[in-house]
Design a protein with these regions (language model features):
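ATP/NTP phosphate-donor binding region
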Residues: 1-61
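Short, glycine/acidic-enriched capping/hinge loops at junctions between secondary-structure elements
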Residues: 17-21, 96, 154-155
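Glycine-rich nucleotide phosphate-binding loop and flanking beta-alpha elements
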Residues: 14, 69-70, 150
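Residues that line or immediately flank small-molecule/substrate-binding pockets and catalytic motifs
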Residues: 10, 66, 146
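Short, solvent-exposed amphipathic alpha-helical segments in soluble enzyme
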Residues: 23-25, 78-80, 143-144, 159
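ATP/pyrophosphate-binding catalytic subdomain of soluble kinases
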Residues: 118-228
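Structural signal for hydrophobic packing residues in well-ordered secondary-structure cores
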Residues: 2, 110-113, 146
Length: 228
């Protein structure tokens, strides 16, 4: 389809080098294949750094394999390069289950056609600040909880949830964004997000807040959030 170079992120399982070896043996591709020359730490920081390098090297599209967290890490390292997020597991909201050949064709089209064609969107994200200083981003949702302990950052007690802010939401999306999604659907192409305030009173919804977990939550107030 006209792609002349394909970059791989290095990883501890040597996935990129295995793919390169198999393709070279079979003679299936004419494109140049290479693994990024960068140290790895076996953490999400590798994904951020790889995304930064790919954008600096002029990548036209980044195919991200993984879940919501992997896509979020890649997004932290990119400014203008589009992401094609491919889900490699279940209960993901941001990446989608896509057949590999179709994903490759879409990535090639996005890289070749560029921003002038209607083949990409400027996605939404939530920017989180602490005491007025930028701290992090979220691609799908950010939650305010009354829980005092950070731990592994997994929240299981929905009774301590106070707010759910989401860029997109649907009742079938596993996670806290489904709480707002039970009231109304917000798509990735909509020019707004949603802010749901939770409490002891208000509309009660039964939401799939985690894989295999349904919780009843009361929404005292919900409103659209315009893009900034």
């Amino acid at each position: 389809m006209g792609i002349d170079r394909i970059l791989f992120m290095p990883d501890t399982f040597q996935i990129g080098r295995t793919v390169m070896s198999d393709l070279a043996r079979d003679g299936l591709l004419e494109a140049e294949l290479c693994v990024l020359d960068m140290p790895i730490t076996a953490s999400y920081e590798d994904t951020i750094r790889a995304a930064e390098l790919m954008e600096a090297m002029g990548a036209g599209c980044c195919v991200v394999l993984g879940g919501d967290g992997t896509s979020r890490a890649a997004a932290k390292g990119l400014d203008e390069t589009p992401i094609l997020p491919v889900s490699t597991g279940t209960n993901n909201v941001y990446p989608t289950l896509t057949e590999g050949t179709v994903a490759g064709m879409a990535a090639a089209a996005a890289a070749i056609l560029g921003p002038s064609e209607n083949c990409r969107i400027r996605d939404k994200r939530i920017e989180i600040s602490i005491n007025g200083r930028f701290a992090d981003i979220a691609l799908v949702d950010a939650v305010i909880t009354a829980d005092l302990w950070v731990g592994a950052k997994a929240i299981w007690d929905t009774g301590k949830l106070r707010r759910v802010i989401a860029t997109r939401c649907h009742p079938s999306s596993i996670g806290f964004s489904s709480v707002a999604g039970c009231v109304g659907v917000v798509r990735d192409t909509d020019d707004f997000g949603v802010d749901a305030v939770l409490g002891d009173t208000g509309e009660r919804v039964l939401a799939p807040v985690a894989a295999g977990v349904l919780s009843t939550v009361s929404i005292s107030h919900i409103e659209r959030m315009p893009l900034d």
